[in-house]
Amino acid sequence: MSKILSAEFHQRHSLVVARELLGCSLVRRLATGEELRGRIVETEAYTPDDPSCHAHRRNTPRARSMFALGGISYVYIIYGIYHCLNVVTQGLGEGAAVLIRAIEPLSGNATMAQLVQKDPANPMRIASGPGMVCRALAVDKSLDGVDLSSQQAGLWFEQGPSLPDQAILQTPRIGINSDPHTVAAPWRLIVADSKALSGTRRQNQGQAYQAQPDWFQKQAI
């Protein structure tokens, strides 16, 4: 088993965490003992000064988990039916997170395909979207607010190979329709050659550009 990412890993700026989660594994242990594992290939960063962030300017019951110290989960529901998994980032009370948008299945593919009712012969489409990630890994609101630096809740991250900047593309986030600056912010990060991405060809290629060395650290200052 690879090293589990520590809580301290997540207690940094959302952009840094979103970048460094790419290539890491997201692991879900089911009640049966089976472990489902996927390589993270798409993330989105959110910070409290961002109007599109659920924690922007206020602490609501829905977003309460976002104000915990980085390293716990924030699971919410969209459209009344789909769950989305985030890892809380930064410091206590800040209200920041990274959304896990897509993974490439590594193990437990047949179970994941069954959970999302997809063809197991096409694993790259099993978890290509935030709602599908949660369906494929059986993640729901019962896993909101759990410690992701421990195996206790059956959901955690494992360290993966470090990806070079040349392998990463930045794009605007998907589904953001607030102020123009927020819409244009390149805070969606993708593994360039992945076949499991959630966006359209235009979103993944036409609106994308290669990540620049040290850009993420500079944005976090």
UniProtKB/Swiss-Prot annotation:
Its EC number is 3.2.2.-. This is Putative 3-methyladenine DNA glycosylase. GO terms for biological process: base-excision repair. Belongs to the DNA glycosylase MPG family. InterPro entries: Formyl_transferase-like_C_sf, MPG, MPG_sf. The keyword Transport does not apply. GO terms for molecular function: alkylbase DNA N-glycosylase activity; DNA binding. CDD domains: AAG (cd00540). Pfam families: Pur_DNA_glyco. The lineage of its organism: Bacteria, Bacillati, Chloroflexota, Chloroflexia, Herpetosiphonales. It is an enzyme of class 3 (hydrolase). It comes from the Bacteria. Keywords: DNA damage, DNA repair, Hydrolase.
